[in-house]
Amino acid sequence: MLKLHRLQPARLLASPRRRSAAITATFTLRLYSTPATNETWQSGNLKLSHVVGVSTPPLYENTTGRLLRDLAQTHADHPAIISVHQDVRLTYAELDRRSDILAVNVARQLGIRRGDRVAVCSGNSWEYPVLQLGLAKLGAVLVPLNPAFTDTQFHAALNNSQSRALIIQSHLSRGRRKTSRDITGLIRAATDGNLLPSVEKVVILDSMAAPPEDARMYIALDGERIRPFDSLLKWYSAESAADMPEIAYLHDVAEDRKYANEVINMQFTSGTTAMPKISCLTHRNLTNNGSLIGQRMGITPTDKICAPVPMFHCFGLVLTNLAILSQGGAVVYASETFDARSTLQAVRTEQCTGLQGVPTMFSAELELKDELKKGGHELLRKGIAAGTSIPVEMMNRLIETLNLDQLTICYGMTETSPVSFMTAPGDTLERRCETVGTVMPHTEAKVIAPNMEPGPVDLTPLPVGKKGEIIISGYLLQKGYHNSPSKTFEAMVADPANPEKVWMRTGDEGVMDEFGYLKVTGRLKDLIIRGGENIHPLEIENVLFKHPAVSQASVVGVPDPKYGEAVAAFIQLHEEYHPPRTPSGTISHKPGPSVEEIQTFVETNLGHYMVPKYVWFVPDFPKTASGKIRKVDLKGTALSLI
């Protein structure tokens, strides 16, 4: 049994480049596994759940800003960003130049320096990648904020991240319009030294959903501390690139390389706690993860990928912006926030070749039969589905209806930058639906015996075919959680066989096959234990998706006096099974399935012990802003109903 001894957590943050040096290990003698060679698992001869990705292409060892500079020289006049709802198109050269200007003005007008945090709260727009890349060039840290945060969450996020500046859209949308009064309150708080002591400057970004007068109204509150976003793009004609000392290092490859391991992004993890942890990610983490994703997707400069996913999340910043831009493709924003109809219209007008999304987004798009009949998606082939698995039925519909025959599946977490496993466009339909693919290049992964209790962790890999906790190692690991050394040490464990190596505990349960394909069976914390039987919600959800009337489904565990826990299922039906939506009842519909029919369907496909004791039909699901179903909310609802 491997026994890990952790030293004082403060050492990790004191020397982030040598984080593993802050962790030592003692262990009793035990045969330690050697990771399988690529030839071993690719040929189907893998015995233990331990794989290492290929070491080609080599990792990019420069900054994100330098990557954009190189891309702008290669693809200068090629479209990089297309914001349909703003009617704005930026070439690579324009994106490079605007991000240069923004970097300089953020330094000169806002007083931001390398390492300072800048919070950004905005919907999808051309300004977001300019901010993402401009702040990276300056060496400042982008802190993306979820527009759906409550005022209390905004205050906590700004204080916990110690952001020195806030760039916020004049009109925030959470699926419905948020009033100007709410935003005014946020801005007043941001300029209140007592409430948010770290925030020194506020920049107002005009929203397409509100007139420019709104921004001017906010600026009038405090002309010294509040300014318009346009001012950050002001170019002084007398200056040239050589007159910008703030980003002069970009011209020297060797000088630029010194900063590749610096943090440029602080991401709030997608946990459902009151204030999620803050993951610290570097140039090296993000540029490489994005580039490797784009390569596995097969992105080329001829591709236009429609991206309705939010930019405050890794799916938007990395799997979309960096993945597509790193390969010379174009990113298409259909709307500020996800709108299924706008997405399909943008695909049609821009003749997109790819589409990103989570299953709930794809489901909403497939429901718009009137929009789909208009066509215009004949060029669609590529894309990414992430967040949770895609049922076979949905994948078939995406291929038949939207031509997404090269849709890839990604697995990861914020703390791993985020993708560690991914399918390839050429993988079989079965593997793209039932697994998350194989390990990414320069990444190492294991499946180990699950142990959610504090204390020593056994890092010995399980035999293939055995379920356990997924752990990840490699360049993609975060530097740590901001101001949370104890949480960092719980999640990031040193390898006793190699003190320089650190493993990220994902908290996800999975099983690996002899070819190295990984199947994620669920969150360990979501496991339902019914009468001693382990039940994985994902297995039941995948079966429910097979029912012809079911559009979406989510399963949670609830207390049960006899078995300890019972299965509860929430189901959303397809549009045609909903009751009429008009008083006249002119909209045709089919009768939906009964609770008993659903229970019989599960029993027939899985067995009696997995049959939901409770079944509720719902019109919609509570979701995170990134589109994931909030199981914690469903569990609360279930507890109130039983």
Give short role names for the model-derived ranges.
Residues 149, 155-156, 355, 474, ...:
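AMP-binding/adenylate-forming catalytic core of the ANL superfamily
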Residues 2-13, 17-19, 23, 32, ...:
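Structural core segment of the AMP-binding/adenylate-forming
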Residues 56-60, 77-133, 150-155, 159, ...:
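Conserved AMP-binding/adenylate-forming core of the ANL superfamily
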Residues 221-231, 352-357, 366-432, 444, ...:
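Gly/Ser/Thr-rich phosphate-binding loop
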Residues 89-93, 255-257, 264-288:
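Conserved AMP-binding A3 loop
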Residues 76-79, 203-204, 209-210, 219-268, ...:
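Conserved pre-ATP/AMP-binding loop-to-beta segment of ANL
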Residues 287-304, 312-354, 364, 368-369, ...:
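Conserved AMP-binding/adenylation subdomain of ANL enzymes
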Residues 438-442, 453-494, 535:
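Conserved ATP/PPi-binding loop(s) of AMP-dependent carboxylate-activating enzymes
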